[in-house]
């Protein structure tokens, strides 16, 4: 869709609820769901607590479902809608962060996919070296870049097929994990603290799933057939992401009983491979690498939409070239120079999660409080008279800052990250709560629409 258009033309609104479901199902059926499950157990939780954390974390997809429903109702993509909550210029900072999030996720997934293809080559007795790594990067990165040439309808069809193929194969792998899991050890796990264990576990899962995907939700919802019931858009988006995420996290929780290093290792895919019989090695690496492609498709598409929404107006071929270069150059640095990329994965999720949790909380509060009867089209145009919506901006700054002040990790030590906030991701949860509280205050000073 061209940035000259605020609303998606009706001729392009071709997505059905089913296609929406498979789009999000495909994006969340990847092997990384097992790793999230192991990360939950790493917070020293019992089996019941871990399953509760996984369920609530997966239900963070209620946020993308809601955003997608707004996108369908208005026919407008995510960060164009966000202009109403922040103002045309005030929206640029969260918009840039969203673009950065998509680009970083894209780079991480391309790097991961490349390494998985290299591992696949090794399983079929092709020597691992610089050449095979380069071939794998060109192949995987090339697939992602080529997806930028396709229409939304074509991408939706591809996502549907990928859902079936990798969904079935992932279930096979899940069954093998469940058969091998130590169920007695799982049920014997001691209970952890509900505040310092369960809540941070929920926060880190939500940051890496529902909160992150909220930015792309209306980018797909805006293309849904206008005759579709809003509830269908909401539930197909929510369940499409939540169901596979929960099932895979449950598998990861059980897998951690036989592979306790899964949550902390620098090579989680290698650890999972070691837990499987050798005969399924080729299928496993195909599923692990192929399962990342749907995520890359969504990230690549939304990154290009967000770049245009920021105000950087380039032609479609130029946008494709810019993002294609990023997809290739960052992995080249990591794969051939730096040599390490997963060590700061949780830190990456935590930082972006704080910024995005407050953004989506304010976006949804603004929609409920001030846009219940629809958005004023003038507020989301590039020439909008409202340059800065200070209610939304100040709420976001205060909420995000509060989240950082109560967060600590290997590279940041917030001054108030003590007690229950020490060494966990409660800052993500706190930033969303503070954002909602701030918007309630804003509402008392506002009447009607902002």
Regions found by a protein language model. Name each.
Residues 56, 95, 123-150, 164-175, ...:
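Transmembrane alpha-helical segments of multi-pass small-molecule transport proteins
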